[in-house]
Amino acid sequence: MSSPRQVFYISDRTGLTAENIGEALLNQFGNLSFKRHTHPFVDTPEKARAVVEKVNRSRQENGQRPIAFVSVVDDEIRRIIKGADAFQINFFETFLGLLEKELNTEATVSGQGHHSIGNTKRYDARMEAVNFSLNHDDGVSDKNLQEADVILMGVSRSGKTPTCLYLALQYGIRAANYPLIPDDLESADLPRMVKPYKDKLFGLTIQPERLQAIRQERRPNSAYARIDTCRSEVADAQSMFRRHGIPFANTTDKSVEELAVHILQACKLKRRF
């Protein structure tokens, strides 16, 4: 089996832009394996030269040319990184010129605009949504639950918490979640805490076999992780969703990104930034 291809995400800020676009591209090659290295805040020539050394060392040690996804605004730093022995995709260099041509104006280049706290409204909306999701995780509180944009329901370990946090971080959505426990699943009614907010409910389900694997890691060889328990809980949860007309999605083969977009569309939610 061939060794994984080395991939470098290089950015003068957080690296999120390079990672997000790079991952979207690499995911189209599911038959290959990659080893990822992220280098954020490469914002000085010295840092850029240090990264170039690491990339070149990787080329020498692995015998394959690394792939580098670069999100750097500064021309000098980009020139230094270009000296690395790697196949490089530079997002600003690739797309900025095309956009300048289409808009018939030169960009006012600044490294402060992307992923910056300078955009106060965007930052505040994100932090408010994250705090809301954390305060309403796993049904811990119904205080101000009426302010939720969406309330995710599902059995334990069906993906509720990461989906809520992703919705909050990426879209500013106030997402709460409620775990369906055996008492809830045995009832014909909706859980008391979320019943007043039926129109905000969205269900998450999962294949029992996948659920068992996740639970087995958390509580090995417990009744909680038995396959018959998982099958029963998943079936009962889906019956509840159908009985009350609650839309739901299967998380088994969906990334959190795909799931979040699906929820936005199904619930007709609009991002806050």
Curated annotation (Swiss-Prot):
Q: Does the keyword Aminoacyl-tRNA synthetase apply?
A: no
Residue positions binding ADP: G154, V155, S156, R157, S158, G159, K160, T161
Superkingdom, taxonomy of origin: Bacteria
Q: Name one GO molecular function term.
A: ADP binding
Q: Which UniProt keywords apply?
A: Kinase, Nucleotide-binding, Serine/threonine-protein kinase, Transferase
- The catalytic activity of this protein is classed by the Enzyme Commission as 2.7.11.33, 2.7.4.28
The region annotated as signal peptide is none
Q: Which HAMAP family match?
A: PSRP (MF_01062)
Family recorded in the similarity comment: Belongs to the pyruvate, phosphate/water dikinase regulatory protein family. PSRP subfamily.
What is the recorded function of this protein according to its Swiss-Prot or TrEMBL entry? Answer: Bifunctional serine/threonine kinase and phosphorylase involved in the regulation of the phosphoenolpyruvate synthase (PEPS) by catalyzing its phosphorylation/dephosphorylation.
Protein name (database record): Putative phosphoenolpyruvate synthase regulatory protein
**What taxonomic lineage is listed for the species of origin?**
Bacteria, Pseudomonadati, Pseudomonadota, Betaproteobacteria, Neisseriales
